[in-house]
Amino acid sequence: MSGAAKTGDRVRTVYLIATEESGDRLGAALMRELRARLGSKVRFAGVGGHCMAGEGLASLFPIEELSIIGFAAVVQRLPMILKLIRRAVDAVLTAKPDILVIIDSPDFTHRVARRVRQRDPSIPIVDYVSPTVWAWRPGRARAMLGYVDHVLALLPFEPAEYRRLQGPPCSYVGHPLTEQFGSLRPDAAEQARREASPPVLLVLPGSRRSEVRHHAAAFGDTLARLKHEGVAFEAVLPTTPHLEGLVRAAVASWEVQPRIVVGEQDKRAAFRIAHAALAKSGTVTLELAIAGVPMVTAYRAGSVEIWIARRVVRPGTVILANLVMGDDVIPEFIQEDCVPDKLVPAVRDLLGNTPARRRQLAGFAKIDDILSTGEQTPSGRAADIVLDVMRHA
């Protein structure tokens, strides 16, 4: 078999655990690729969302039960979280799968993996999406040797980090965004709109409720200040259906009313015509870089989260696109720096043909080569490694 491991004739059980929407999408794609290789000789069990349900997974519990963010929220719901961890561990051990694949959400999935390894060391474990060991708590990489057999990395620099930190074997399989380059790149008409006046300014306050609440005021005030300074722009705010109500309420008092677009398709259409963006730091920075949209990034969180982060996060950029490019071309304004006095000049600088704008665009031009996985898709590469680990277990 080309790339895929031969696993014999018996039906293989793959147990997957994904507790967030992004992990749910990765899990569904992995299920499709494994089924393409094994046909009827594979069955799936585990925890997932709507995408994995579409591939036939009956989730152990709804992943919405874990849709929380912030230290305070975790503390308040800790008994429920611990109960779900125990439930997941017991379910894995009862299923006796040929492999356990944990997908992202390390605060939950790694606790499950450690307990499974302690109680049944015979079950091989693959971690799909590396924790950010290169940014904070690097000792986690070495600790993972005790309960993870292979890490599937979405970022090209991560395998070298695992070698440096003496962690488990790690392979770059590719970021799922590499399969979506076309949907983020403008056609001729969209490029013309991108270069026309007034320029489209994307406003991206976050993809979670707490993120929207933390960033809305500063972003709204920044738009108002730009308007008062005579800067021409059209503000567009993409959001998701489950956040639409919160976003509309948050921007109702803004002096500059953005055009709100809802859903992934309309979001990407907005990216294709955007001239610049003001964004909460996160995966969206890599999407914007792929789309060729220069950006200013910001990050605000609760005081407890920031206090903890400043004691454990390694110095340096936390912007995903900067990390991938290996160059700090995108400015970031964190916590007390996330204020209009600093955001306004940075955004204004990107709305013109400035050195700062040109420097970002030059960095974005390298993204395709850096993220390339050749002819194989990320989910295909991931499936082959999962099968290989299963074969050698």
From Swiss-Prot:
One of its GO terms (biological process) is lipid A biosynthetic process. Signal peptide: none annotated. It is an enzyme of class 2 (transferase). It catalyses: a lipid X + a UDP-2-N,3-O-bis[(3R)-3-hydroxyacyl]-alpha-D-glucosamine = a lipid A disaccharide + UDP + H(+). GO terms for cellular component: membrane. InterPro entries: Glyco_trans_19 (IPR003835). Pathway: Bacterial outer membrane biogenesis; LPS lipid A biosynthesis. GO terms for molecular function: lipid-A-disaccharide synthase activity; phospholipid binding. Its EC number is 2.4.1.182. PANTHER family: LIPID-A-DISACCHARIDE SYNTHASE, LIPID-A-DISACCHARIDE SYNTHASE, MITOCHONDRIAL-RELATED. HAMAP family: LpxB. This is Lipid-A-disaccharide synthase. It comes from Rhodopseudomonas palustris (strain ATCC BAA-98 / CGA009). The gene is lpxB.
